[in-house]
Amino acid sequence: MGKGNSKLKSSQIRDLAEQTYFTEKEIKQWYKGFVRDCPNGMLTEAGFQKIYKQFFPQGDPSDFASFVFKVFDENKDGAIEFHEFIRALSITSRGNLDEKLHWAFKLYDLDQDGFITRNEMLSIVDSIYKMVGSSVQLPEEENTPEKRVDRIFRMMDKNNDAQLTLEEFKEGAKADPSIVHALSLYEGLSS
């Protein structure tokens, strides 16, 4: 699905409706827009970055967009096909908190080893700070990516092993609403 400008088959629409929080009608509408913007049925990383630039014109979203792109690109072929796009969009826009946090964990776990290290988190947080630019006024204790990451690790890394498991990440994010709010910074595409 996605190679070339093919129409979605009704069986594919049905499957996507079962796999996502979108109705068949919504999937058809999203598909129409996807094919309009990506006539070959593939969204490249450069195209993805361009979309983020529209949402964050005051900052530099290119690094963050690249990180998000890698999570959307499930089969790691260097392009986002419609089914990958709609599944990720479903989780980030309509998923429950656990689903969103699991998705966010995959975003932060850059090497996909099942843990978030301080450096991985710093890469993501730094890219978020670059993306939002000066549009968001941050409190003194979080006005640099390093301070933010230190605060998150102090709160989440319960066993002090300098890495976060999925469980530590979920528990910490649920305990601190500001972290869940910060996670929503990357939902510009779906809001």
Curated annotation (Swiss-Prot):
One of the record's GO cellular component terms: membrane
Keywords: Calcium, Lipoprotein, Membrane, Metal-binding, Myristate, Repeat
Compartment(s): Membrane
Additional note from the record: Binds three calcium ions.
Organism from which the protein derives: Caenorhabditis elegans
Name of the encoding gene: ncs-1
Protein name as catalogued: Neuronal calcium sensor 1
GO biological process per UniProt: chemosensory behavior; chemotaxis; regulation of signal transduction; response to alkaline pH
Pfam family, one: EF-hand_8
InterPro entries per record: EF-hand-dom_pair, EF_Hand_1_Ca_BS, EF_hand_dom, Recoverin
GO function term, MF aspect, one: calcium ion binding
Lineage: Eukaryota, Metazoa, Ecdysozoa, Nematoda, Chromadorea
List of residues binding Ca(2+) 3: 157, 159, 161, 163, 168
Residues that bind Ca(2+) 1: 73, 75, 77, 79, 84
